[in-house]
Amino acid sequence: TGNPTLDKTVREDKNSTGKNTGSLTNTTDGYAHTASASIGDTVDYQIISTLPTITSKASSLSEYTYVDTMSKGIRHNKNDVVIEFFRDAGCTDKITTWDESSGRFAVAYDDAANTMAIRMTESGLSEINEAATVYTDSVKRGYSDCTMRITYAATLTADAKTGDTDNPNEVVLTWRRANNTYFDTLRDCCHVYTYGIDVLKQFSDNGGNLRNVKFKLHNDSDDCYIIAEQKDGVYYAKGFAAKKADATTFVPNSSGHIVVKGLEDDAYSLTEIATDKGYVLLRDAVKIVIKTAENGQCEKCGAKLLTASATVNGKDVTMTDGNAIVPLTVVNNPGFDLPKTGGYGTWMFTIGGVALLGAAAFIVVKSRKHRGEQ
């Protein structure tokens, strides 16, 4: 037909623990219509469009504009748009690259509407329509039937929706030929998901001070600790740390809950690092796994959507709030903790015990000797 195509995909950025190599040239490196990310993560977007067939001035392009609309929980990073042109659909045979300083396109942001418009300027359209670098001795001209790839990034914020209610992002391509009085449009979208946990801390005898209980949360899949900030009684993930000491210490609220939102679908370990005096600290970390699977189809883009499920210590749990939150309960029992085997404390207990036994034996022998003398 000679008309353009439009495909938009997303991935979690490599530096935000994305499951990809971070390639800037491989269009299949982790990109898909769906992705999972944590709050504070950077997500990479790419828009790929096959340009229409151009054979004359009449069939040349007079308009080629993208309007990208983010949901409330995702914000464009801004000033990072790059456009590349390729001879092939696989984006391996590059023709040229434009950045925002090239003058070939203009970018405009509307923060209130959370949109970004990318419009080809006159010089950009002129190059697309008339460049002589691709075709010789052909009826085609310019970048006819070539592939345009646009890349940019955004950040997942605390406003992101959790669970199977995703955070969609739609792009609309508006284009027109010089010999037409009407515009044509194409649409595509992709979806970002994020999740959370709700830890209920209890004492078996209903005693204990909840404020003395402390936890650390480790992402086992990415081998990092969670950093979060608290707002209105809820912790929102905002980053990660390599060292445990740099991670957030999670403390239950007055009702015993620790709610952490903005976690991607990964495996986690929840470790209790402190509890109230007179109670036994949890011996093992609680193992939490959040998984996703394809379920349903987007009415706009036709992509398979995701649904979440979870396990706690290997057992299936029913997620709440539309598969958004993993619920779990942690109980401390009265008692006291012995130092760990092989530690300094064990040696002190051993030496102390031997000393006490020696003293007792000495007292018994001394007592018997004293009675004998009498």
Regions picked out by a protein language model, each given a short descriptive name:
Residues 1-374:
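Solvent-exposed loop/turn and edge beta-strand elements of beta-rich ligand-binding domains
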